[in-house]
Amino acid sequence: MSTTSIESNNDIGRSVKTIGVYSIGPEIGKGSFATVYKCFNTKTNESVAIKSVVRSKLKSKKLVENLEIEISILKTMKHPHIVGLLDYKQTTSHFHLVMDYCSMGDLSYFIRKRNQLIKTHPVISSLLERYPSPEGSHGLNEVLVIHFLKQLVSALEFLRNKSLVHRDIKPQNLLLCPPLHSKQEFKDGGFVGLWELPLLKIADFGFARFLPSTSMAETLCGSPLYMAPEILRYEKYNAKADLWSVGAVLYEMTVGKPPFRADNHVQLLKNIEKSNDRIKFPSAAQVPESLKRLIRSLLKYNPTERVSFNEFFNDPLIVNDLEGNDEPLETSEMDENLFISEYISPIKSSQKSQYIEPITTEVAVKEKSKQDLPAREVSTHASESQTKAVDTRPSSRDEEIKEIINKNSPGPETSRSIQPHNLKEKSLVLKNKDNDIILERDYVVVEKRAVEVNAIADELAHAGSGAVAINPRRTSSGSDNSYNGPNNMQLYRRPSLRSNSSGSQRRPSFTDRRISISISPTNALTKAIGLASNRLFGVNASGSPTNRLIEETDERLAINENNSSMNATNNTFSTILSNPNFANNLLIQKLNLPTSATVANNSQTNTSPQLSPQSKTDESVLNRLESLATKAHAINLFADVKFSQLIPSPPSSDALDDDLLHQNDMLPPKIVKSISEEGVVLYVKTLSLLAKGMVIASDWWYSQFEIDDPSNKNSNENPLKQSSNNNSDDLSLAVRINELVQWIREKFNECLEKAEFIRLTLQEANTLLSNEDSSEYMGNSNSVADKTRVVAEKLIFDRALEMSRNAAVNELVKEDLKGCELAYSTAIWMLEALLDEDSSNDEDRLDDEDKAMVEKFIVSIGNRLSVLKRKLEVV
C-alpha cells in the first residue's frame, strides 16, 4: 500500500492524498472513533467510502475487539442489502475500511431533509412526486415504507441464518443507494423490493455479534432511542432485540419520529413502560392497519410476546409482491458520485440552519483547531506566534465548568418540577402564549442593546490605535511591546469583526464567529481576560501556547506565585473563570475568604494612596466591569450547556460510543421547546449583565470629556490624548478597561447570535407542537409543566445549589477536590449574578427576603470554599 509519508492521527483528509489505489475525497461522516470519506479508485474510477479509524482512540481492548469483529463480519458478508467491505488497509495511525459508497446518505437524513432534497435532488424529486407522503404527515408513503422494509428484512434474514445479531439497527445505519439502471440488473443482483426505487443497505457492524438463538447477551450497546427495553434494563437479551429496533425504525418511517423519546435512558424506559404496549399513531400519518399491526407486534415490551423471526419474515406485507410503477425514476440529471448533502443548495444567512453544521464544542475546537481550518488559515495560525500563545483557549477550564454544570443538570422535564428551594415563584405560572410574548419582548430589548454595545466598543477601540486604544495616556515607564505596532491593530480589526460603520449589523455566518473567537482571538481580548483574571483571582498566570490540563495549570500557577509582583499588563490568560484559586476582592470583603500574600499585595498596591483621583475612579470602574464580566461568563457557560443540547454535537470524548452521539439528533419537540426556553432566558440574563457593563463603560468614557475638558471647547478631540502627562497607573487602568470592553462586546455579540439560533429553534418546536396531536406531545393540557414560565433566576438558583451540594458530597469523600473548588467558585458567581438585577425589569426582581436567602447561600458556599482552600494548601 502506498500512502504519502505524512498522516495525521485525527484527520487523514488534510494530509494524506491516497490510500493505496484510492484517492481521498471530502469527509461525509464522522463518529467517535472514525471518519468516513468519499473516495474513488484511481484504477477503475469507481467511488468508494473509506471508514478511517484512528488507532490512538481505541484505548481499550473492547474497542479494538469491536473493530476486529466488524472487519471479520464484513469480510464474510456478501449480500445485496448489506454494505460490503471491498478492501482493508492499515497504517501506523489508522485502520482503513474500504466500503460500498452509498451516495444517498442514510435513512434518517432522507426522512428529515426530504422537503429540501425534493427541490434539488433529481431522484428524490421524482420519487416523492410519484410516492408523496400523506397530507400533513411527516412519514413516508406506504409504498416506500414497505419497499425499504422488504430490503431490511432480506438483510436481517441473511444475518439470522448466520446467527448474527446486529444490535444497532437505527435509521442512521440504514444507507441508501440510487436505483439500478434496469430491472434485469436488479434481478441479477439478488435485490428485493421495487427495482425502480432506491436501495437500502445495513451498515455499521461495530456492535454486531455471533449470537445463536439460544444464547443471551448482556452488553449495553446500540442507540438509546431504538434500544429494546430489555437492553435498557441491563438484562440479558437475545436476537429479538433487533426486532424491537426494526419496529422502532418502521414506526419512524411511517410517522416521521421514533415511537418513544426522552433525554436519557431511564426516562426512555419509563416512557416505554408507561405505554403498556399501546402504540399510538397520529391520524395525519394515515398508517394502514396492516402496518400498524406489524409495528405493534414488533414493539412488544416483553420479548417473549414479541413476534418471532419466523412470523416476521413471513408476514403478508413482506412476502406479498409490492405493486409499483415499473417505470424508472428520473435519473438523467443525477451524478451518482455526488453525496446527497451536496445537492442541498447553500443556505441563506437568514436561515437558522447556518448555525448548526459549523458549531463545535470548545473541546472539539481545541482538538481540531489546526486540521479543520483551511490551509491559509492554518498557516496564518502558525505564523501568529503572539496569537497562538493567546489562544490557550478557554475550553479547558470552561469545558470543565460546563461539565460540572451539565453533571448537575436535571433533564428539561425534571427541571420544571424541581421546587425552588424557598425561592418565591411569584407570577411564574402563565399561559404558553404569554410566556412566548415575554421571551420575545426580552429578546427584542436585547437586540436593540446590540447597537449601543457595539457603538461604545467601537468608539473606545478607535479612540487610540486599535489595541493601544487609549495610547496617548501611555508613558515610557508603562510601555509594553505587546501593545505596540500595527500588527496588533490588524489582528484586532480583523474582517470578521464588526466595523464602526456597521455596528448593528449581524454577521452572515456563525462559522466566522467561531473561528474568530476560538482560533484567532485578539491580543487585546487575551490581555483583557488575563488582567481580569489577575484581579478576580489574585494570581498572575502566565500564558501557554497549548491548552494544558487543569492539573498542569494549577501547578503552573503555584510556580508563578513567586513572580506575582510582575506588572499585570504582561500577563495572558484564556478566560475569566480559568483559575480555581477563587479570591475576588469583592467576595473577599463579603465572605472574609482567606487571601494569599499575592492577593494582599495586589490589593494594597491597587488601593495605594499614591493613585491619582482619576486612577481611583478608573480602578472602581474596572472592578465593576470585571465583576459583571465574570458573572456573565458563569451564566453564559450555563446557557452554552443548553445550546449544546440543541445542536449535533461532534465527539468530544473518547469514552463515548458512536451510537450515543445520535441521542440528540431527533429530540421530541416538547423537549426541544423546554431546552430552548431555558437557553433563551439564560442568554438574555447573560446579555443583560454584559449590557450593564457597557453602560458603566459608556458613562466612564464620556465622563473623561468632562474631566479633561470641562469647558467642552475641544469636545471633538479624544480627551485622553490631552492627558499625556498622566502617570502609568492612569494609562494601565484605562487600557485595561478598554480591553475588557472589547471582550464584553465580543461576548455580547456571540451570545446574541446563539440566542437567535435558540429562538428560531423554539419557534420551530412550537410550530411542530401546534401541528401534532395534543395527546402525542402535550399530554395533559392543564399540566403545570406546560404552563410554567421559565425564569432564569430560578434556573440559576437551582443549578448553583445543586452544584454546591454535589461538591460538598465529593469533598466529604475526598473525591476530585479541585473540581469541588471550581464548582463552589462557579456556584458563588452564579448566585452573585442573581443579586445583579436588571433595573428595567421589575417583574422578575427578587424581593428582600429572596435576596437575603441568596446572600446566605453565598456566605455558606464561600465558607465551604474557604475550608476547602485550606485543605488544598495543606495537601
Curated annotation (Swiss-Prot):
Residues 367-379, 390-405 have a biased composition (Basic and acidic residues). Serine/threonine protein kinase involved in the cytoplasm to vacuole transport (Cvt) and found to be essential in autophagy, where it is required for the formation of autophagosomes. Involved in the clearance of protein aggregates which cannot be efficiently cleared by the proteasome. Required for selective autophagic degradation of the nucleus (nucleophagy) as well as for mitophagy which contributes to regulate mitochondrial quantity and quality by eliminating the mitochondria to a basal level to fulfill cellular energy requirements and preventing excess ROS production. SUPFAM superfamilies: Protein kinase-like (PK-like). It catalyses: L-seryl-[protein] + ATP = O-phospho-L-seryl-[protein] + ADP + H(+); L-threonyl-[protein] + ATP = O-phospho-L-threonyl-[protein] + ADP + H(+). Pfam families: ATG1-like_MIT1, ATG1-like_MIT2, Pkinase. Residues 367-422, 470-515 are annotated as: Disordered. Keywords: ATP-binding, Autophagy, Cytoplasm, Kinase, Membrane, Nucleotide-binding, Protein transport, Serine/threonine-protein kinase, Transferase, Transport. Residues 380-389, 406-420, 473-490, 497-508 have a biased composition (Polar residues). It is a peripheral membrane protein. This is Serine/threonine-protein kinase ATG1. Its EC number is 2.7.11.1. The gene is ATG1. The active site is at D168 (proton acceptor). GO terms for cellular component: autophagosome; cytosol; phagophore assembly site membrane. Belongs to the protein kinase superfamily. Ser/Thr protein kinase family. APG1/unc-51/ULK1 subfamily. GO terms for molecular function: ATP binding; protein serine kinase activity; protein serine/threonine kinase activity. It comes from the Eukaryota. One of its GO terms (biological process) is autophagy of mitochondrion. ATP binds at I28, G29, K30, G31, S32, F33, A34, T35, V36, K51. It is found in: Cytoplasm; Preautophagosomal structure membrane. Homodimer. Forms a ternary complex with ATG13 and ATG17. Residues 22-318 form the Protein kinase domain.
